[in-house]
């Protein structure tokens, strides 16, 4: 868990005098870091008492073909590119914008697996 409030330091290096301490609502959560594997999800309580489904491992993606308008459930083979971080390719981490190789071909992930709990993608080729 990480505190995500305003920094104690100014841009000049001086300190702000805080009017109050840190609050629990300002704490963020660790990234889900979704891998390729047998489906595993985690439900976490969020602000307002709602639930958020985090995908920890995913085996399949819902791939949409823009030309035909069809959507199919397809097995993910590997991660080919990831603009977020080059190390994510080596670790096979699934994030939004990552290019994955599937049985149908290459696809770009459009959903946020760590926030939505599912993987939706659009076919590139």
From Swiss-Prot:
Keywords: Ribonucleoprotein, Ribosomal protein. The keyword Coiled coil does not apply. Signal peptide: none annotated. GO terms for molecular function: structural constituent of ribosome. InterPro entries: Ribosomal_eS8, Ribosomal_eS8_CS, Ribosomal_protein_eS8_arc, Ribosomal_Se8/biogenesis_NSA2. It comes from the Archaea. It holds the Pfam family Ribosomal_S8e. Residues 1-34 are annotated as: Disordered. One of its GO terms (cellular component) is ribosome. GO terms for biological process: translation. Part of the 30S ribosomal subunit. HAMAP family: Ribosomal_eS8. PANTHER family: 40S RIBOSOMAL PROTEIN S8. Belongs to the eukaryotic ribosomal protein eS8 family. NCBIfam families: eS8. This is Small ribosomal subunit protein eS8. The gene is rps8e.
């Amino acid at each position: 868990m990480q505190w995500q409030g305003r920094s104690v330091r100014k841009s000049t290096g001086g300190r702000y005098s805080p009017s109050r301490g840190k609050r629990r609502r300002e704490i963020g959560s660790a990234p889900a870091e979704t891998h390729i594997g047998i489906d595993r999800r985690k439900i976490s309580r969020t602000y307002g008492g709602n639930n958020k489904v985090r995908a920890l491992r995913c085996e399949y993606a819902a791939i949409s073909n823009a030309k035909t308008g069809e959507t199919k459930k397809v097995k993910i083979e590997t991660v080919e590119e990831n603009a977020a971080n080059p190390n994510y390719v080596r670790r096979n981490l699934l994030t939004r914008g990552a290019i994955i190789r599937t049985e149908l071909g290459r696809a770009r992930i459009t959903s946020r697996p760590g926030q939505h709990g599912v993987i939706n993608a659009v076919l590139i080729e």
